[in-house]
């Protein structure tokens, strides 16, 4: 059975990609053929073949199957701004059919796929469509990444309610410590446990060096 998940966050810069890389590694260790997919990205670095997004690079490295840059990230904008705005200015439309085609191609190679969105749940793809409408169309199970910081509780509750109201399955949430641990972190998480009804998959600790992560020591559960 092929498992397909969509990673969303309570905001931008909540650590979606780092958590995605951990989940991909965990799934690989569980015997799955894993693939990370970043259908739309903004903010890139120049390469000989053009430019590529850093998040997509990490997803590619964390996947167990071999994927090309284009397979991982078919739509990439160089500037760091909302994709639908860049799409308008650069006259490069973002079509849901293109996102679906990329996902379909990866599905032929992998049985555990993690799709990383951009920003939060209702990030626009165009003036008419949001990422959430595409997720619903593809029947993807959603995982919420919550950065533990001031304001995260309200954002997390709103995000889960929005997903449920869209009649989409929420497979769980992960608390991500993006700042060095302080005395209130566990109180944030305990409050979230009281309010968020979706399965709690675990806590990702703060990493001083994100290039030296011991994946085996991170105790998060894979979504079902």
Swiss-Prot record:
Its EC number is 6.3.3.3. Pathway: Cofactor biosynthesis; biotin biosynthesis; biotin from 7,8-diaminononanoate: step 1/2. GO terms for molecular function: ATP binding; dethiobiotin synthase activity; magnesium ion binding. Its main location: cytoplasm. The keyword Magnesium applies. Catalyzes a mechanistically unusual reaction, the ATP-dependent insertion of CO2 between the N7 and N8 nitrogen atoms of 7,8-diaminopelargonic acid (DAPA, also called 7,8-diammoniononanoate) to form a ureido ring. This is ATP-dependent dethiobiotin synthetase BioD. It is an enzyme of class 6 (ligase). Belongs to the dethiobiotin synthetase family. ATP binds at residues 13-18, 55, 116-119, 176-177, 211. Substrate binds at residue 42. Coiled coil: none annotated. The gene is bioD. Its cofactor is Mg(2+). It is found in: Cytoplasm. Mg(2+) binds at residues 17, 55, 116. It catalyses: (7R,8S)-7,8-diammoniononanoate + CO2 + ATP = (4R,5S)-dethiobiotin + ADP + phosphate + 3 H(+). GO terms for biological process: biotin biosynthetic process.
